[in-house]
Amino acid sequence: MSKQRIFIAGHRGMVGSAIRRQLEQRGDVELILRTRDELNLLDSRAVHDFFASERIDQVYLAAAKVGGIVANNTYPADFIYQNMMIESNIIHAAHQNDVNKLLFLGSSCIYPKLAKQPMAESELLQGTLEPTNEPYAIAKIAGIKLCESYNRQYGRDYRSVMPTNLYGPHDNFHPSNSHVIPALLRRFHEATAQNAPDVVVWGSGTPMREFLHVDDMAAASIHVMELAHEVWLENTQPMLSHINVGTGVDCTIRELAQTIAKVVGYKGRVVFDASKPDGTPRKLLDVTRLHQLGWYHEISLEAGLASTYQWFLENQDRFRG
């Protein structure tokens, strides 16, 4: 039996590289990989020619333009245009070249700012988005709807997964624009090295957040991609087909900071500056649908933080920032 030819778009990113690591361990697939220099995903002709020549069987669409609040506010046109072009080019070229299986990776920012907690898939389009990343969220919603539309019109098997907050190897550890886990890991690491008496964390520490290790995200993505078509259809709806991916468990920012201090070995005080904004009180995905499909996360938060910190220590000369 010939090997499945699988294209991972975005194989150098945090999620794409995790999917690559897991698929590389198998003997029944052949991975097709292209760097940004080798294939410009914003160029529809180049993407079409690539699909026409490579005979792809499956696509993991993990490529995206990503960034923090400042970048989203500064370059909103770039975020909506580039993400919609990447999705449109890949999904349309896949269809034109008879690729029947595709998995689109989105983001939990697709849900309304004031969505019911925990957020079920049915919360999509039920309210106003968070203004700071609305262009990015709109692009991710468009990706879901592209998949659903090609399924409805052409009978394709294009699926979507929406991850919660991710962390792990190949994350962005830049001091000014990283997400909470890499930011705190780096801050506690530097405080330990400098024997700082305390580390100040913004906010009261009471907001609750959910975190998923990127290796679990990769495993969930492969699980959803490989579900029998009938099973996937039974557990989704044609116009509401995306699947949340998370742990279904959240923790306070205070608990997160204390766990990171423990993992890093920081012995000083952790101080919460309640004069700084807290953000949304709670953000948790409802993963009932994912559990019904037989997938549960395996990596505990403390174990995941420990392995991520180890990766950080081993890659300080190359991490972003």
Protein language model annotation of sequence segments:
Residues 3, 9-10, 14, 18-22, ...:
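C-terminal substrate-binding subdomain of Rossmann-fold SDR/epimerase-dehydratase oxidoreductases
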Residues 101, 106-107, 144-172, 182-184, ...:
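Conserved beta-loop-beta element that borders a ligand/cofactor-binding pocket
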Residues 9, 34, 59-65, 102-108, ...:
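SDR active-site strand-loop-helix element
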Residues 24-49:
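Adenosine-cofactor binding site in Rossmann-like domains, unifying the SAM/SAH pocket
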Residues 135, 139-142:
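Active-site helix of classical SDR
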Residues 42, 110-111, 166-168, 180-181, ...:
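Conserved sequence/active-site signature of Rossmann-fold short-chain dehydrogenase/reductase
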Residues 44-84, 96:
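NAD(P)H-binding glycine-rich loop region in Rossmannoid oxidoreductase-like domains
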Residues 88-133, 159:
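Conserved Rossmann-fold NAD(P)-dependent oxidoreductase catalytic core, especially the SDR/UDP-sugar
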